[in-house]
Amino acid sequence: MITAANLHRSYSIGKKSIEILHGVDLHIAAGEKVFLCGPSGAGKTTLMYTLAGLETPQEGKVAIDGTDIYALSATARSVFRNRNMGFIFQNYLLMPELTALENACLASSIGRRPRVEYVTELMERVGLSHRLNHLPSELSGGEQQRVAIARALANDAPIIFADEPTGNLDRKNGAEVLDLLFGLAAESRKTLVIVTHDEHLARRGDRIITIMDGQAV
């Protein structure tokens, strides 16, 4: 469960201060698939980063399963984030010198099963068992995003944050990637928080939160 109360976030540009988030309140239940939508520059990504503990608000509170993440030290917050969150980004962020499997292993932690064994299983689930030893440059955009999905799921975190995960893909590949993410997340009832400008894709979630004029509406 994610709860945000009275979030304010602003940036300084020259001598001007521009407020991106203006008193945002929201509640996301465990297992929900929520899309953050709104026009360019509305603050969708800023809100996601603030909910994830990556950008500190000037005012307000974010609680995840009752833990006030901004009351934690920076080190404790990083540990909490690594245990509880996975991330998928529009530009994949794969290390060019590492294989697909090695990239997918980067965010994982040793759990009940050996790490490489578990991640290899995830790579099979995302349809890349034949591409484990390929470099990112040898993969299509859709395949690279599948690696990113496996990486986000590798530490078995209960929350997945995704920033425009289909933004660099065509409509068909984007829908396939979203289907894959939804299916894998549903198996362990993960919470999905997805930033998108594509309202067609957003309609497939449980709920759409629109960011307008710095507020969630």
Residues covered by each model-derived region:
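Conserved ABC transporter NBD signature motif
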Residues: 60-68
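Conserved ABC ATPase signature
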Residues: 135-145
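Short coil-to-helix segment of the ABC ATPase nucleotide-binding domain corresponding to the Q-loop/switch region
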Residues: 98-106
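Conserved ABC ATPase "signature" region
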Residues: 68, 113-130
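ABC ATPase NBD coupling module
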Residues: 15-16, 69-86
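Catalytic Walker B motif of ABC-type/P-loop ATPase nucleotide-binding domains
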Residues: 160-163
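A short, proline-enriched helix->beta-strand linker immediately N-terminal to the Walker B motif
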Residues: 154-158
